Amino acid sequence: MTRLVTDPFRAQRGMALVEAAIALPLVLLVLIPVGEITRLFVQYSTLAHHTRSAVRYVAERAISDTTGKPVITSALTTAAQNIVVYGAPMGGGEPVIDGLTIAEVSPPVITAGGNVQLSVTHPYRSLLQLGGRLPGLGFAADLTLEDLPMTVAYTMRPL
């Protein structure tokens, strides 16, 4: 005997896969830029944290004699640059941010007001292989992330 009643779920088979195939590119279009911008903020925060730590390190040790005038020695300069790049005054190991080098860290200087200043400029390198661009898709201009310079500068009074 032939079956006259059909299974109502039989017609729905495969629909979830088709819907997922349609929705996945749209979801990725939203999530990938969010992830990339989050990565940018994390790297900037890490760079700012280590720069601030280096300035504090120099500010605590810059007063070397009884005159009260700050003096930055070459050992202090090297230690400050190592703190920014490696996270420790002695240096060594992996950089805290991929691609960060000592050359990108300016030596700490004494400003006209007697404060210690340190600045770092490091280009952000995108993980996206889209030429470093996040497409605006007609809603906004394309956002260029390739070699976006992250510049951090801190000034502290010697303690």
Name every feature range the model reports, one short phrase each.
Residues 1-13:
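N-terminal leader/signal peptides at the extreme start of proteins
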Residues 2-3, 49-159:
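Short, conserved structural patches
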Residues 12-15, 43:
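Glutamine-centric residue-chemistry signal
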Residues 13, 20, 37, 50-53:
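Residues within well-formed alpha-helices
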Residues 16, 20-36:
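Alpha-helical hydrophobic helix detector
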Residues 26, 43, 72, 76:
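Conserved acidic
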Residues 36-48:
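Membrane-proximal amphipathic alpha-helices
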